[in-house]
Every structure is written in C-alpha cells, then in structure tokens.
C-alpha cells in the first residue's frame, strides 16, 4: 500500500504543471422543500428542478418576460435529495485536493432559512472523514492536520476556539494573502478531537431568532483545515518535498429583508452588516465573471478580503447555492440564481504548493558550506594568474577602443574647424555685398510703383510648420505666395460689389526644383530635370516681357544635395530655418499689413540680385540664371508653371546654357568642396543620427515622423540635406523650449506641453491598431521582445509606451521603427514617401470663394 501511494505521489508531482490550469468554479444548486410555516400559510412552490442541471420558474405569467424562466448549472438537486449525494457529486473532489497540496474552498450561499447551515454541516463532516481516511491509507507519508475557526460578526473577526471575544486583525501576507492575526490553530490528534472542536465552534457562533428562522446564523463562519504532508524517510532530494495546503468550509449568513424578517434593534444591525458584506461579495463575483475588467474591490469587506484567494486565485472552489421554492421568496431566490450564474463564469488557477523539506535544505546548505571552505583553504594560483591575464586583455581592448574614439573626435574637430573657417568667409562675403542692396521704402503689400510683387518666394512665417501632431510629420515647410494681379485687375476686383471685402492673396504651392547631379546626365536623359529649392513667381508687367526665376541654394554649401527626378509628380518643398523672433512676434506692425519688399534689382545679363534680401538671410548670396522662356500668360499675366518647367528643361538640355548656368550658380566650385567633405559621411551620419534620436525624445516628436525619417534616410550621401535640416529644426525647438518660448505650427502656438499631449494621444492611437495589424502570436512575441509580461493588463498600451523610449539604443530604434511602420502600413506605401517627405500630408487650409474661383481659372493654363 505504501509503495503504491509513493508512486502515485511521484506521478502527481511530475504532473504539477498540468494541474496548474484554469478551471471554472463548481456551482451546485439545492432546492429545499417547503417548511412547516410555508405549508401552514398555503405557500405555493414556484420553482422546480426539471432535470439534473436546470431549475425552472413555473409562474411566468406573474413575473412577465423581464427575467429568464430557466437557469442551468453544473448540478441541481431537489428537496428530497440527501446531503451525501450533494457532497459526492462535486465537493468531495474539491475537498480531497488538499491532501495533494492544492488549496480548496467550499461555501454555501443563499437567503435566510434556505438550508445553508444544514448543507454545510453535512459537507464538512463528510469531507473531514474522507481526509482522515486518506491519511490512514497512506502511511508512507507523515501528515499534520491543523484546525482553526473564525466568524465575521458585524464586520468584526472573532476566534471561535477562544473564549475571548476580542476582535482580531487582518494582515496581508505576501504568500498566503489576507491572514488573521493571533487566530488559534489546533493540531488535530484524531477524529474525536476534531468533533470536539466543531462542537465548540457551534456553541460559540452567533445565532438568533427571526420571524423567518428560529435558529438564524447572524455571522459568517469559516472553518479552516491545513494539511501538511512529507515523506517519512529521507530517500533523496526528489522524494523529500513537503506539500502544504488548506481547505476552507464557509457557512455564510443568509441575506434577509427587514420587512419580511421583522427585525429591529440588534437584529436589524446584524442584517445590515450581513447584507452589506454579501453585496460586496456579489459585486466581486460579477466583476470576476466579466474577465477581471476594472478594479475589484476586495477591501470593501473583510469577508471578501479573506476569500480573495478562493475567488479567482490559487484554489479550487465549489459553491452550493440553496433556494426556497416559496412564492413569497421569489425575488430573493432569483437574486441567488443570478449570483450563481455569475459565479459559474469565474475561473481559478490552482497549483500544487510544494515546500522543500528541512532535511533536504540542510543537506544542500552543508554541501555548499563545505565547498566554500575548501576554496578558502586551497586557493588556486593558476586560476589567479589566468584571471590576471584575462583582465589585462580586457584593459588592452579598452585602450584600443579609447584610441579609436580619440582619433574619431580629432577628425570631427578638424572638420568643425574647416566648416567654421568657410562660414566666416561666407559672412565676410555677405557683409561686403550688402552695399549694393536696396532697402525697404514702404512696408505695404505693393512695390513703390504700385504694381503687385513679382516675387513668389516670400516665406510666411505664420505658415511655417515645425511639428505636426497628425499621423505624419513633415519637415519645416514654407509655402510660397503668388500675387498675380495687375493694376487694372486690382481695380476691377475693388468694384462697389466687392467694396466690403478685404483684399485676398492668391496662393499656390509650387514645386521645388533641385540641382541635377551633372550636366552629362542631363544631356543623356531628356526626362531628367533640375530641381531648385524654391520656384519664384512671374513677371506682372502687361507688355509680356520675359520674366525671370530665382533659384535658392541651401544655407550650408556642404549640405548641397543633387537628386534625380524621374517623374513630373515627384515634388519637394523647400526647407528653411525657423524665422527669427523679430519676424514672427513683432507687435508693432498694424493688423492687415504684411511685409513690404524692395524693388527688384537686376545686374548685367538680366540676373536678379538677392544680396541682403529677407528670404536670403542666413544663406549664401547667389544669383539666379535668367530663363529665356516667357513666364507671362496671355490672360491676366498669370505664369504657367508647366511652361516654365518645359523651358527650364530645354535650357538645361543645351550644353552651352547648362554650362553657363552651372558657372553662374557656382556648382563646379561647390562640387569640389562637397566631394572633399563627404568622404567621411557614414561616420558623420551616425553621429548626427544619434543627436536626432536624442532631440526627438527631448522635443516629444511624433512617433510616425520618427519612423518615416528613420526608415527613409539610412545614410546615403544624397540624404545629407534632410539630415541637416532635421537637426537644425530640432535644435531650434529644443532651444526655444528650454528658454520657455514657443514655436508655431500652422498659426497655432506649440509648447512642450502640447507636444507631450499629442505624443500621448498618438501612443493611444497606435495601441488601438496593435490588435488589427498583428496576430496573437505576433503580439506575444512583441510583448516578450519589449519586456512586457504576457499576463499583465493593458499590454497594448504598454507596448505603445515602450516604442521609441530609448534614444541611446539604436537596436531599440530599429525595432520600434519596424513596429510603427507595420501599424501605419508604411511598407505598403513604398519608397515614394522619400520624395514626398518634405510635403505636408495634412489637409490644406480652407480657401475662400474668390481664391477658389481664381484657381479654377488657372486650370486652363496648365
């Protein structure tokens, strides 16, 4: 017998992982027969058991259709069914789990006078008898059974084994949960000792008489049996484990109505406390049945605090709901059935509680102590020398690494010095060229001669975008305004019919043209065109003279970038440094008056001079080549952008014109300068990217913007202009935020608080897309990769908060970019996003009716 029991225990310990599985609470319903009072009162029985799992309400006409008439559970018992059968069908297996090291609980729930105490007394007696029978049959293990009993009376905990009625305190134990302090715990000697203790508990428990029950329980009673088992002989570490678990027999007080129980005084107070604790228990059960959503208020009642491990924790649980079939108790019976319906949806996860025996622990500690003593007595010199050699090699590697870093820093210092010298020369050149520049004569929207401005490259500082809180964040974009009125057209617009309207500016976003890689590529492929950063406007003169366009070179000569455009739809907007505070925040300008610009001054050869102009501040002073294609349209003098581009392509395809143009704008000299400084571009790119990652985190930049930028610009020399512009933009934002200033985004004030709020809103949006873009297995792998517990709450929001949270970790940046790219479907958009990155992807600003009509009239010119 003992050998068989030992083998069974070994199998049980090996299958411990399988035992620790989720299972639902076992719910049994017992319908008692009518008692003598109900029979004398001619009460009708409205409830009956139609089979072993269903309870039916027969009087459906009285209640209507608001409630179901049938309820199904694990087992249902009629009034004539004995308690032994109720115990054998379900609670027996749950109770005997305690001898296998699994916690278990059995409790009765129902209204007053429904038979809870009667049922629990029988179940407790049968369960304890089976536990002792199991102990007597398994002599190869030593069992220790401890008994304790408490009651909760008016929210005060009393020890039923102690004559002292002093309330006991609850304390939180990290392993056992809520534990009662100083509760008496008796070690059982035999079966007779247990019966004596149960008799003491029945005598100590609070019992009162009401109109519904002569012996009504006025408190919740909890009887706890703790079973600890271990092998009688030390047969090795694997056979020396100790199992310890507990089983709780809980007899709850019944819910009652004061109007039916006719209670008053002390009985009324007792009923209030009973109903309040049962209400808290029902709330906890209902929340657990809904998948543990929201906060579960275990601490609202001492009953729920003690039962917390039994409700959805490390325990197997069985609930016996007792019902009264009388018609006068229909509402109370229905509430009990609703509680049972919620309870059967609650899941628990019980596991075997294994405790290492003291003998095995002592043996292990003795071996560890002997090993440490031997190491102290016999030190190994060879190992020490080996350790010294390893340490020296590590130091040498560190020295080599530091030498490489020193060489890299020296190289960066030399590059910075050379750039500083070039910048100083550039400043001197700008200062010397300011002598021939005209000044502003009148700050109005017209030139001095009354004609409308011919320049279309004027930057509106209020429309300069710094950070976008949408799904895509473009670079700083300056929108060019085209004013295309002559004096006659202006007078026509200011007719009496429009006298009350304010004059409007007609805007058009124009494409930006950049420099080609070389003149030879232009001659070989007629489809390629040069892109300048900003396309200037048209000539507003009525005689149709040839207009001129101005090409603006970026501010840093070393960041010049030449690209090839393979389609006419690939457009880029010019990037610019943020406007000065004097331009954006100047309060002395009257409302309605914008910037006024000086007369255009042309040099020899029809070249437009831009030295010391408002749009060239901080950039190189360059000259734009005059294009021989007429830019003035036939109707109203409106420039045709398409005809301008066609003329530009024809001009560039001419070797003589292209050479002249390259000579005028200084491309040959710039190529030599750029080729010398871009040799170490890969190292410079890594350094600048690290700075950008840090500035993104500091300025709370949009995650989608970070992902687009990180994936599009991967270190190509052609990406240098984007890297430089982004770095300058972020540096400006950081400086503004650190000084307490603000930036502007489409006419709105942007602060660090608003950026942080937009970032939080974006993270919540991305968390909602996790379930749509990733499968269950993919989400589980992502949670493990980002260090999120699989069983934790709000895992998707945790994942969104982890994205782009480590600016100094490039591996984390790569993983974050991959996740965000899939969430926003960046991969499906293709590489065309790189050509469009400088454009604003947000909806355009609303246009007025007159501006819309002007745009419709422009359609014929394109």
Swiss-Prot record:
Transmembrane segments: none annotated. GO terms for cellular component: microtubule. The gene is KIN7E. SUPFAM superfamilies: P-loop containing nucleoside triphosphate hydrolases (SSF52540). Residues 494-505 have a biased composition (Basic and acidic residues). Residues 463-505, 542-632 are annotated as: Disordered. GO terms for molecular function: ATP binding; microtubule binding; microtubule motor activity. ATP binds at residues 110-117. Residues 24-346 form the Kinesin motor domain. GO terms for biological process: microtubule-based movement. PANTHER family: CENTROMERE PROTEIN E, KINESIN-LIKE PROTEIN KIN-7E. It comes from Arabidopsis thaliana (Mouse-ear cress). The keyword Transferase does not apply. There is a cross-link at residue 734 (Glycyl lysine isopeptide (Lys-Gly) (interchain with G-Cter in ubiquitin)). Residues 355-428 form a coiled coil. It holds the Pfam family DUF3490. This is Kinesin-like protein KIN-7E. Signal peptide: none annotated. Keywords: ATP-binding, Coiled coil, Isopeptide bond, Microtubule, Motor protein, Nucleotide-binding, Ubl conjugation. Belongs to the TRAFAC class myosin-kinesin ATPase superfamily. Kinesin family. KIN-7 subfamily. Residues 465-476, 612-621 have a biased composition (Polar residues).
